[in-house]
Amino acid sequence: MKVVRLTQDHVFKPFDCGESDLNEFLLHDAKLYAKGLLAVTYVIEDDDSTVAFFSLSNDRISLLESDKATWRRIRNSFPHRKHRSDYPAVKIGRLGVNANSQHQHIGTDILDFVKQTFITNNRTGCCFVTVDALRSAVSFYESNGFKPLRKINEGDTVPMYYDLTQLI
């Protein structure tokens, strides 16, 4: 398997993760997001198919997006002179694993790859990884160290974060 950064001339290999929204993003929107400089998408391919994909964009964590207890915990993890009104993050905008490859820890491998990339090759400075997790995926992200930004979450997704500083 190889990780490839999506380009405008990329030819997609077969992919279906079972979530039509994710399939549509990869096959129809990912190149548009890249062209508009909104997100960078990476595909993981083997000889015959797209095994998985994920897209990354810039983000931030601020008091407005979190409850006070979470914000206090985040802010207190930094020395007082480093307290800010928000902190830089990288957002996993989309992550999908081909249905044929699910339950093989590929999603966890992707999260580990993103975490290590931003620890070892952090070009712009970010200290968190964020995701708006589908409710059905919250336990997956929790098992990979992500925490909810708010105690009360309404809607289809749950904003979550991972603190990269715990890896250094």
For each of these PLM feature ranges, what is it?
Residues 39-43, 53, 89, 94, ...:
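Short hydrophobic/aromatic beta-strand element in the GNAT-like acyltransferase core
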Residues 37-55, 68-70:
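Conserved beta-hairpin
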Residues 111, 118-133:
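Conserved GNAT acetyl-CoA-binding A-motif
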Residues 55-94:
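Conserved acyl-donor/pantetheine-binding loop and adjacent beta-alpha core of acyl/acetyltransferases
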Residues 93-103:
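A short, internal acetyl-CoA/4′-phosphopantetheine-binding micro-motif in the GNAT/acyltransferase core
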Residues 1-32, 36, 41:
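Short amphipathic alpha-helix that is part of the acyltransferase structural core
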Residues 130, 142-162:
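Conserved catalytic-core motifs of GNAT/GCN5-like acyltransferases
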Residues 103-117:
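Conserved acetyl-CoA-binding loop-helix of GNAT-fold acetyltransferases
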